[in-house]
Amino acid sequence: MSLPQHESPPPLVAVTGATGKVGGAVAEQLRARGPAPRLVVRDASRAPGWAEDVAVATYGDYQAATAALAGVDVLLMVSASESADRLTQHRTFIDAAAAAGVRHVVYTSFLGAAPDAVFTLARTHWATEEHLRASGVGLTLLRDSFYADFLPELAVDGVIAGPAGQGRVGAVARADVARAATAVIGDLVAGDRRHDGAVYELTGPEALTLAEAAAVITRATGRPTVYREQTLEEAYASRSVYGAPDWEVDAWVSTYTAIASGALDRVTDGVERLTGRRPLSLAQLLADHR
């Protein structure tokens, strides 16, 4: 008499940033595919109502993070909110993932991550990548360009002001980053190892100057928006009124200087390769959000 065969449970996926734009979209897409992922959140009350497997932890709490990641096979690690100690938080969370036995981490990094990147926050992403590589955990890096969703938010009273010059940026929609992450995770869960150690550069379908982006915003929203060039000194002076710490002001200004440097003048096929569809243009993104 043959014994009944018991199938092993599917790999457990955990998603961080599940109450945010990218992590939340990935969580919803994975749920639609089934089974639903574990959501690692800072505040359980903000988790979506459908979530049954919710773990509470912050990136900087090693003990809580280790417990939250117990039994997890594949982890989407959405980069933490900008802060002075973000790198320390990232390293702590990666150490917790390794200790918990996580087999593979998909990390949302930044296009051009490097120790000397013009965009200051890209340096933190590079250091995070290096720590992830040293951890021994499997990895896939999604190096996103600036979010296209963020471009309209740069305007203050209809003016985008900064030292970006004629530089161009291949900004990518958050929705496309989420779809790309979901595709990678789906392959990993299915046992497809093509993404092991892979680095994907995710951009939109076009690289725009900020003046061109302002024109697109005007046409798509009906809100007159223009770009005004600033010197470096003007950029720092105009942002000093917010009382932000130096590291944050440096990050704000380097958003523009990174564009001016040409570092973000990139258009790749990363989104289409992973998702099978062309990425959204800024005009399409804004039309979808009307």
Predicted regions and their residues:
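Oxidoreductase cofactor-interface core, primarily capturing Rossmann-like NAD(P)-dependent enzymes
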Residues: 2-47, 60-63, 70-72, 81-91, ...
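A hydrophobic C-terminal alpha-helical subdomain
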Residues: 195, 233-290
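Hydrophobic transmembrane signal anchors and adjacent membrane-proximal interface regions, especially
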Residues: 56-57, 92, 276
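Rossmann-fold cofactor-recognition segment
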Residues: 51-61
